[in-house]
């Protein structure tokens, strides 16, 4: 037993230690994983160890020298995965995915430049293999020893156990890590590069399977639905924004109850209140709801730019990032010659934006790397809203007009922290820190927005621009109902929670008078609304929403979980309420038909995403977006 440990097991232990060391060092030196806090650092140290024990432990099932050779082969394959990601990250500032490998638009674009991003110190990543080969040559006695399969199985099971311990603490630090899949960086940071590769492979296989069995016949029911639900444009508004810039402003986690709300007698959002009452000739939709699922912000982006719902689980931005889309920026480009851009104070890989934006057809993506991310400018998820808006002005000025620009704010994001010097409003006093802090960050966002309007005017961009402002999703979850009862002065029942899913939608169209519009609608309706304002008929495109200004608008608002709201009925968990009074009602033929329609709408939208059906939807005057035509940031710098 002593010799067994000395030779065979010591070779395994040496392989594990060397492999762990090079992987951990690569995490620290090659990748920008954004590790924060002790827990994340411990997990970063731990995750290469669990991977090494499991994968290298598989070789222990073989006998003698063959075991060591298999261990070397496994080590080499894992090193290949590591080094391929290192090179890819140096070029694209992102991790490899299986779709990347198949796409010439990403890996192929590296071309001869791959040699320019190799470095002399890269030999370090193969040093452990050289050491292990030397040990194998100089210690031939390895071939004499056999290990019991029971012991080898115990090692492998230990690797699996270590992974689940890793996963437990990762999920504790970042809930819904795998179901929502925020960012490839997060998966690598928490679970490791090798587990990320497996995860990506499984996700890709699932997507490819669904896609492989789809055909153009599957699109027929979708086309029938969208054709029958088409709402023709309102002549008063159709084409009223033609040729004008569109500036779409995303208010992070902003709910409509903040509009006109006073905290201790003081308005929380005085500028937005002014806009909501027709200031700057803004039209305010006060019965507008978010329709996001687990994908939250990414679902809102997807829905508003494509008029399709996010998925029932996870984020379509991540899992369906390679799909074909008939998006608003692509249509505006091909029909009216618009330049499109996203401006955001977070890094581009979050929510897989750097990949899916290429499939949506955004010409430019200004992420955190293009802004001043010094400590005084950053809080919570990224860049503070005031410097974000100020620094965005020259970026907007650089765009060829007309442009469609999407600006995504961040400061009003959970946990709603704010530096004391930036706070102009005292916190609420419910005792729930999340709710109490929410009002401070909402006020800061309101001030930043007012500043942005002034800066747009000073830059000469205001007069010729449609400005759309929207809240992406709720900021306060049901976990805070006690505090919200105190804030709103009413019990937060299931009915009231559904009403609380209202988020603001404000649209300023130059030359059109503003005011309050009581139409019921949701994020699914934004794309056809903007198309009609631009004078582009939405009828031939696959839209699950309808124009908010149309007299034929469908005012049934479907939530991602199958609940719904109309001006007359609210349905939560199949219980029907009167929308105006909250009184419980008995289900009737009308509510049953509404439920059937909502389920059909969600199901058909899911089918479009799961089966990538828009690749079959051919239009004479619309060309499918080619992602290889788009390049963002760092990947263009290497020649």
From Swiss-Prot:
Induction: Transcribed under partial control of SigM ECF sigma factor. InterPro entries: Alkaline_phosphatase_core_sf (IPR017850), LtaS-like (IPR012160), OpgB/LTA_synthase_biosynth (IPR050448), Sulfatase_N (IPR000917). It is found in: Cell membrane. CDD domains: LTA_synthase (cd16015). Residues 25-41, 89-116, 172-639 are extracellular. Substrate binds at residue 413. The keyword Cell wall biogenesis/degradation applies. GO terms for cellular component: extracellular region; membrane; plasma membrane. The active site is at residue 297. Mn(2+) binds at residues 252, 297, 472-473. It is a multi-pass membrane protein. GO terms for molecular function: metal ion binding; transferase activity. The keyword Transmembrane applies. Its main location: membrane. Pfam families: Sulfatase. Pathway: Cell wall biogenesis; lipoteichoic acid biosynthesis. Proteolytically cleaved by the type I signal peptidases SipT and SipV. Residues 1-3, 63-67, 138-150 are cytoplasmic. Its EC number is 2.7.8.-. GO terms for biological process: cell wall organization; lipoteichoic acid biosynthetic process. The record marks 214-215 as: Cleavage. Could not restore staphylococcal growth after ltaS depletion. Belongs to the LTA synthase family. Catalyzes the polymerization of lipoteichoic acid (LTA) polyglycerol phosphate, a reaction that presumably uses phosphatidylglycerol (PG) as substrate. This is Lipoteichoic acid synthase 1. It comes from Bacillus subtilis (strain 168). The gene is ltaS1.
């Amino acid at each position: 037993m002593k010799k067994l440990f000395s030779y065979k097991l010591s070779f395994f232990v040496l392989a594990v230690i060397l492999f762990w060391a090079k992987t951990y060092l690569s995490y620290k030196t090659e990748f920008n994983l954004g590790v924060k806090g002790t827990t994340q650092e411990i997990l970063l140290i731990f995750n290469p160890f669990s991977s090494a024990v499991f994968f290298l432990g598989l070789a222990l099932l073989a006998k003698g020298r063959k075991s060591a050779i298999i261990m070397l082969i496994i080590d080499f394959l894992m090193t290949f995965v590591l080094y391929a990601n290192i090179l890819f990250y140096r070029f694209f500032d992102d991790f490899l995915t299986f779709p990347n490998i198949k796409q010439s638009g990403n890996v192929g674009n590296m071309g001869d430049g791959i040699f320019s991003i190799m470095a002399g110190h890269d030999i370090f990543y193969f040093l452990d293999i050289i050491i292990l080969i030397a040990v194998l040559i100089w210690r031939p006695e390895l071939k004499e020893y056999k290990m019991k399969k029971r012991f080898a199985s115990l090692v492998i099971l230990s690797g699996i156990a270590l992974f689940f311990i890793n996963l437990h603490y990762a999920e504790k630090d970042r809930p819904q890590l795998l179901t929502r899949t925020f960012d490839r960086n997060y998966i690598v940071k928490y679970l490791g590069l090798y587990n990320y590769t497996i995860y990506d492979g499984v996700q890709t296989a699932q997507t490819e399977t669904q896609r492989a069995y789809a055909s153009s016949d599957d699109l027929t029911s979708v086309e029938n639905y969208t054709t029958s639900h088409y709402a023709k444009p309102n002549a008063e508004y159709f084409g009223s924004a033609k040729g004008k810039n569109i500036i779409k402003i995303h208010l992070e986690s902003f709910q409509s109850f903040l509009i006109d709300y006073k905290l201790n007698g003081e308005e929380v959002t005085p500028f937005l209140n002014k806009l909501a009452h027709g200031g700057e000739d803004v039209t305010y939709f006060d019965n507008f709801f978010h329709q996001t699922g687990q994908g939250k912000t990414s679902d809102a982006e997807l829905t508003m730019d494509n008029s399709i719902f996010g998925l029932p689980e996870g984020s379509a931005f991540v899992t369906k990032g390679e799909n074909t889309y008939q998006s608003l920026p692509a249509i505006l480009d091909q029909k009216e010659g618009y330049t499109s851009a996203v401006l955001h104070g977070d890094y581009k890989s979050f929510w897989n934006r750097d990949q899916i934006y290429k499939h949506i057809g955004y010409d430019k993506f200004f992420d955190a790397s293009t802004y001043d991310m010094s400590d005084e400018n950053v809080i919570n998820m990224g860049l503070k809203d005031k410097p974000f808006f100020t620094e965005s002005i020259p970026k907007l000025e650089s765009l060829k007009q007309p442009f469609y620009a999407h600006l995504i704010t961040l400061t009003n994001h959970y946990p709603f922290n704010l530096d004391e010097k930036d706070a102009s409003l005292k916190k609420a006093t419910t005792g729930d820190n999340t709710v109490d802090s929410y009002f401070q960050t909402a006020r800061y966002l309101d001030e930043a927005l007012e500043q942005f309007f002034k800066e747009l005017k000073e830059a000469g961009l205001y007069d010729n621009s449609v400005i759309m402002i929207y809240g992406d999703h709720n900021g306060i979850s049901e976990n805070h109902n006690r505090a919200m009862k105190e804030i709103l002065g009413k019990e937060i029942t299931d009915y009231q929670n559904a009403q609380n899913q209202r988020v603001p939608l404000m649209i300023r169209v130059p030359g059109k008078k503003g005011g309050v519009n009581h139409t019921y609608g949701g994020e699914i309706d934004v794309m056809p609304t903007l198309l009609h304002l631009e004078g582009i008929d939405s009828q031939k495109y696959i839209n699950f929403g309808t124009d908010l200004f149309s007299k034929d608008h469908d005012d049934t608002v479907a939530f991602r979980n199958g609940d719904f709201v109309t001006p007359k009925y609210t349905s939560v968990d199949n219980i029907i309420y009167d929308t105006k009074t909250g009184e419980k009602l008995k289900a009737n033929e009308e509510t049953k038909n509404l439920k059937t329609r909502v389920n059909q709408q969600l199901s058909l939208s899911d089918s479009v995403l799961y089966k990538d059906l828009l690749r079959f939807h051919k239009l004479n005057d619309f060309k499918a977006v080619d992602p290889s035509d788009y390049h963002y940031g760092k990947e263009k710098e290497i020649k």
